[in-house]
Amino acid sequence: AAGGTLLLLARVAAPEALLVSIDLRGGGYGGGYSPWRRRIYRAFARERQRIVLIDGDSHAPATRERLLRHLAGRPIDFLFIDGDHSYAGVRRDFEDYSPLVAPGGQVCLHDIRQHPLGYSGEVWRFWQELETDFAGTRAILEPGVAGYGLGLIGLPEGPSAGALRADRAVLASASLPILF
């Protein structure tokens, strides 16, 4: 809700990257992009980067269509999912958006460790399935911290896949009520 992740992603993305953030207006963590937030978040872009802010439910077909228009046929190199923390919600975000990721690209999920008070929702349950289904998973966990954590999935490379090339360094966030 505060834009910290968007700022950090803009700092590490390619100079020409397109960064797209999807956020549900009025979500449980104050989501959406008010005019003042839009000005601030767009100022995160550096060099020739472009930041697109989409107010919408990541599960709505119209939201996905808006993303596709902005991508204009380009694949996503890095997809960060930190939205609907229900099992069904995070699974749907993964199923709807991971097919848009380039071969050799990465998908990152936030809050993959079960929190004793339930703060991380059920992302951890879906992460356990992904660890079984994908050989290239990696958990990034802070020792001694309950819950949270990042789960990284490296998608298999195809014959045309390359490392985060500048001509297609696209980042997206399917973040329902939590992020940006």
Where are these predicted regions, by residue range?
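S-adenosylmethionine/decaboxylated-SAM
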Residues: 1-180
